[in-house]
Regions:
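A short glycine-rich, Lys/Arg-flanked "PGG" loop and its adjoining helix->strand segment in the class I
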Residues: 136-148
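Short alpha-helix
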Residues: 197-213
Length: 235
């Protein structure tokens, strides 16, 4: 695993440098990352339906899909979607041992969505990078593509319920990144690079999107200040 020494110039991109350091970047930048990822994987396995498709919207390097497939095996099929060519290349290599069970597909979710029905959909730190005006349509598509009883596992960076809470969450989040070895300069460079690219919304707004799409049950399964994860079940 390459160490994250990425120094972004201009707007943030999921380029080859980011792809190489991505696992280290997540482990050091996402609070309780291992806990969140394990919970997401466990829920995907728990709710997977026999002989259905599992779709990862924003699969990055494909690691989580491979973890799920290592348990479910050929009882299911696996589709990873991303828009970054370096990420797609890494995901194809990661998922190659699955052979025909897995596909990695280049799609821009702003204008193109997978037509296949599925049993489980993952969206892990993906919607936050998509302009807000497209998000409800994407969540609606995921709901409509799920089989009855199927689930969406949604993980997002979020805003606090008010400005004071957001400011407190961000301050403590940056303190965590310092503890994980990032410098103040690296934190500031990444913050500026992500402005207007990563656009979080409140937890309540995310939950409203899930309910408005028609999900019968929605619950939060993980939260750390300005990060949250939900399981949404189709009725």
């Amino acid at each position: 695993m390459a160490t994250d020494r990425v120094q972004p110039q201009g707007a943030w991109k999921f380029d080859a440098d980011v792809t190489r350091a991505f696992d280290d970047m997540l482990a050091r930048s996402i609070p309780q990352y291992d806990v969140m990822r394990r919970a997401t994987t466990d829920l995907a396995i728990r709710f997977a339906q026999y002989r259905t498709l599992i779709v990862d919207y924003g699969c990055s390097r494909g690691v989580q899909l491979l973890e799920i497939a290592s348990v479910l095996g050929d009882d299911n099929r696996y589709l990873g979607i991303d828009v970054s060519e370096p990420m797609l290349e890494a995901a194809r290599a990661e998922l190659a041992p699955l052979g025909a069970l897995a596909e990695v597909r280049a799609l821009d979710l702003r204008c193109d969505l997978p037509p296949e029905p599925c049993g489980v959909a993952l969206s892990v730190l993906t919607l936050q990078f998509i302009p807000i005006e497209h998000r409800q349509r994407i969540v609606q598509h995921i709901h409509d593509s799920l089989a009855p009883g199927g689930v969406l596992l949604l993980v997002e960076k979020v805003l606090g319920a008010n400005h004071a809470l957001s400011a407190a969450f961000v301050e403590l989040y940056y303190a965590m990144k310092l503890e994980h070895g990032y410098t103040n300069d690296a934190i500031e460079r990444k913050r500026l690079s992500l402005e207007g690219v990563l656009v979080p919304i409140t937890a309540a707004w995310n939950e409203d999107m899930l309910h408005d799409a028609g999900f019968a049950s929605v619950d939060c399964y993980w939260r750390w200040m300005n990060f949250a994860a939900w399981v949404a079940i189709k009725g």
